[in-house]
Curated annotation (Swiss-Prot):
Protein name (Swiss-Prot/TrEMBL): DNA-directed RNA polymerase subunit beta'
Xref: Pfam families: RNA_pol_Rpb1_1, RNA_pol_Rpb1_2, RNA_pol_Rpb1_3, RNA_pol_Rpb1_4, RNA_pol_Rpb1_5
EC number(s) on file: 2.7.7.6
InterPro entries named among the record's database cross-references: DNA-dir_RpoC_beta_prime (IPR045867), DNA-dir_RpoC_beta_prime_bact (IPR012754), RNA_pol_asu (IPR000722), RNA_pol_N (IPR006592), RNA_pol_Rpb1_1 (IPR007080), RNA_pol_Rpb1_3 (IPR007066), RNA_pol_Rpb1_3_sf (IPR042102), RNA_pol_Rpb1_4 (IPR007083)
Family per similarity comment: Belongs to the RNA polymerase beta' chain family.
Amino acid sequence: MLDVTTFDELRIGLATADDIRRWSHGEVKKPETINYRTLKPEKDGLFGEQIFGPSRDWECSCGKYKRVRFKGIVCERCGVEVTKSAVRRERMGHIELAAPVTHIWYFKGVPSRLGYLLDMAPKDLEKVIYFAAYMVISVDEDARHEDMPGLENELRLEIKTLQDQRDSQIAERLGRLETDLAALEAEGAKSDQKRRAKDGAEKEMGQTRKAFDEDISRLERVWEEFRSLKVGELKPEDAVFHELQDRFGIYFEAHMGAEAIQKRLEAFDLEAEGELLREQIATGKGQKKIRAIKRLRVVSSFLATGNSPAAMVLQVVPVIPPELRPMVQLDGGRFATSDLNDLYRRVINRNNRLRRLLDLGAPEIIVNNEKRMLQEAVDALFDNGRRGRPVTGTGNRALKSLSDMLKGKQGRFRQNLLGKRVDYSGRSVIIVGPQLKLHQCGLPKQMALELFKPFVIKRLIDLSHAQNIKAAKRMVERSRGQVWDVLEEIIRERPVLLNRAPTLHRLGIQAFEPQLVEGKAIQLHPLVCAAFNADFDGDQMAVHLPLSVEAQAEARILMLASNNILKPSDGRPVTLPTQDMIIGLHHLTTLKEGVAGEGRAFSSVAEAILAKDQLSLDLNAKVRIRLHDIYFGEGEAPEGVELDEKGKTVGPVLLETTLGRALFNETLPVDYPYIEAVADKGKLSEIVNDLAERYPKVEVAAALDRIKDAGFYWATRSGVTVALSDVLTPPTKAAILSGYEKQAAKVQGQFEKGLTTNAERRQELIEIWNKATAEVAKAMEDNLPADNNINRMVSSGARGNWMQVRQIAGMRGLVSNPKGEIIPRPIVHSYREGLTVAEYFISTHGARKGLADTALRTADSGYLTRRLVDVSQDVIIREDDCGTGRGLDLPIATKGADGSSVRDSNVENSVYARSLAADAVNEAGEVVAPAGSDVGDVMIDHLIAAGVHEIKVRSVLTCESAVGVCAACYGRSLATGKLVDIGEAVGIIAAQSIGEPGTQLTMRTFHTGGVASADDITQGLPRVQELFEARTPKGASPIAEAAGRITIEDTDRSRKVILTPDNGDEPHIYPVLKRATLLVEDGQHVELGQQLHVGAIDPKEVLRVKGVREVQKHLVGGVQGVYRSQGVPIHDKHIEVIVRQMLRKVTVVEHGDTDLLPGELVDRARYNEVNRATLTEGKKTASARQEVMGITKASLATESWLSAASFQETTRVLTQAAMEGKSDPLMGLKENVIIGKLIPAGTGLAKYRDVTVTATEEAKAERYPNRIFTDESVFNESDLSFVDFDSFSSDDYTPGTYN
């Protein structure tokens, strides 16, 4: 089979009939599958062994040849080649069609490629293909022109003859009438007899005249049609056409069905058509020009690739290998088969019937009907349901065609190529393992034994505990003692991967060193739970085994939990102590007044512990302890304490602290500044962040483990419990509420008197009750004692927040109704007091809405992540520095009123972890930091202190790398805290960072109901999607297209904002809804791009009016706004990566002398390259306008057809790609995963993969100490250390011969 490592590009094209025959191993002639008695495949059938290979390895069908020694022999009795049965997965067959059929993708796809090429409407095409009309294929213009006068004379003569015949017949009838009338007169007949005779004669003459006139007019129509006949014309199947064919059939050719299309395509002159269309584009306007451009795209594709358009009509249908459309026997003798077999059988049956009809010379009408049925059968095989009603199987279920096999989540791309399952894996429930180190996990013994079974067996044989594999297997199954010893030895320092679904970001899979544990549950380190989003309420996790040495090395170096302390989304630690640990450390470091031992002094921590053990000292009492070698931060040392230059105390120091704090500081690194504070959640976060910034990962991991152990130890001893008596309702609650009740009654009274509107009443009531709730909450907080256990949990940050406590102990407050409006009547009781029935009922709305929202959010967020990954998957760091001087100017501080610098609140997620693009200069013009400096926490503090307010930083938005981005523009990798490595897949990390917190974003806002409603403003997840899809928002606000003055025109029905530009251009008129809140006033002067009323702005407008940089700012700011409002930190650079991909394409406006087509979407890099080449030749370059594309559209517009096809609209992408003969450069990750190559990221990058290792002189000398090396030495090439040179004697060797 094809080796994926041997090629770097993958091209798709249109297969010709010869190609299909070349792939095939034989023609499938019969619709039979297998013989139901012998269960062997039928000869020449859909499973025939003669075509597709033997069903059993090394065995022909009749059994004459068995065993591998007959390999390659074709049995003369049954015609089957003796080979492996695996060839039934690769060998194809074919069906020779009795009549050509069109490929449904090219005729029925949108747009119809066949329609564009032949300049026909899809409706007309359908008429021809399905035998409802004839198409003129060719006209012999010269012969027609030459014979026209003679033919016309003949026809005129014929018409004259017909006219003469008509006249003579009518005259004859008239004569007869006169004779009859004379006879009647003579007989003395009555007048009504005469009238009858007269009427009868007139009727007869009328019929004669009509018959002759019809013939004459038909001949005239036939002549007119013949004169004006042209290629491509459609003719209905009627008497006129048959007459035309009979009389003038030698001058033209007309056909029906795919045959007509095929003949047109074979005679189609692509070059001439291309020239004609270019001319039309140059001179045409409007719709005509647009259609010409679209047609030229199709024509150019065929011209460029050399594909024959006739390949869109099939004469041969390929039959895929039988193992890919299997047939399996069920219990009870029935068979289950792939739908494809049924579809193939329909094609074969109809094809055979058509062939028989043609051989019998059946009438054309019957043959045409059979051809149409064959066309429909092939259509159903390729894309069932695309045209007309789908072919159904049992239970009215539409059969799955070849297209359905590729499409959607269950299709080949997403199910089997991008979603493979792996062996060497297992899964189990997780439980907490507080005794583990950060890089360890507890693996159940039985599970480990099963996972490492092959390795255990090999080691047992190596150690001679077993003689062969079978014996070793038996030992393992019986769990002998030696097996456990061997298992312990094997798993030592051998990492395993743990994964928890859903894997929303890269921290969802991490490596750990397994520790064997009893039981059946996997033990997980408590600090990594946040990264996995795991808890221990029944969650399950999967274990995977990295097998190769390279995989183990990557797992250990890149994926080990102790190396993944930082979150890739914002570069801050993810392994923070939580819950019990925080309670324990909070208990340890709290300071209490008036407890045992307060004010005592101790010579060491050990002595203080002794006093505590004797119960004479409280853990939290303020005492003085003598400590040695303590470090203090700048300005933090107590008075009188002397420090050296590193901040370390000189000699011992008697420090006023608590025993708990002294113990807590022992968990931190020796040279870490002494912490004299309560370790609550915020403080711990600060400490861990600082540790991660200052120390190597090994030390950070060790410190985190010590902090964790101390947290659990002291949480146990803190005795924190919760009883109902801890829930204290404030005694002042009733008084507070009665005051607000009076205010509410007053507002209600004003409304009832008609002094206020309903909206104003609601608004005022909501404000009153919000104040009441806040006051009750304040009273409740003040009422809770400091040592109250609920208070301790919330104030330490271990669990819960004040809002939850308020609902339990204070009052629930305002809730919303099912419409999302706030009900202006609060729930005045708390859960502790119990709710009334009415209160309970109105609470249920919010609860139910919350659950429904969460379910919707999860699906939406997952789909957003998928689109983000798809659009950014080929953004990989490809080079060190692209050399650009461009960058973004970002603020880091503002000048306060007192002249001091105030740090910008968004610094953490905007400038942090980037590189300077230009020197950072303060107001005095001094360079504070040179260009290229890394901007970390320390640097930011240094810049602000030096009075720098704005810096220019490198950004992926301004990176000029042709493929991917460069390391300098990206800056630090947030996951490691160092400059990003070449090969890092920053696009996927960006997508994960944005998508992972997606579930936390609300679906939509709550409406307060009434005037101040945020009704039309989309927020939360839908807003993020709207921005990334670059959609025009609902109720979008216009922006000023020029600087100028505003005039507002208000009428009863409408409102207009008129902008008169300063430069005297035409005024711009913006119609505005009456209910919109304007941001400008009559007569106000506005600047370019200023927003005119409240609402979101359309990104496409921002791009058109203000340019690329502004639309970048708008998109990044908009997305950040949503995430910040939910308190989710994400670094700007991730959003910038996605925005870079959205602005990747330009639309060609004028093509100049280039090959580009007007209206074509082109990659900016390719556009610049084409223009550069055109310029060097001295020709006219193309012009283009920048596009902002939504992420879905951008994913489908990628250069890689494999990636686009596996994303969405599979059939459309493949149709287009095959027609254009597209070549996939395999630069992204998806396309390489699909074909099974190493991904071009990380260690899979060619830069790292194609490394050749050459030994240094020292290494050689060390390995071969007795040999002298010269450059010609054979050892430079290979290692011949196994050769015993001394055993050669000179007699054995003569030059040029071997004995």
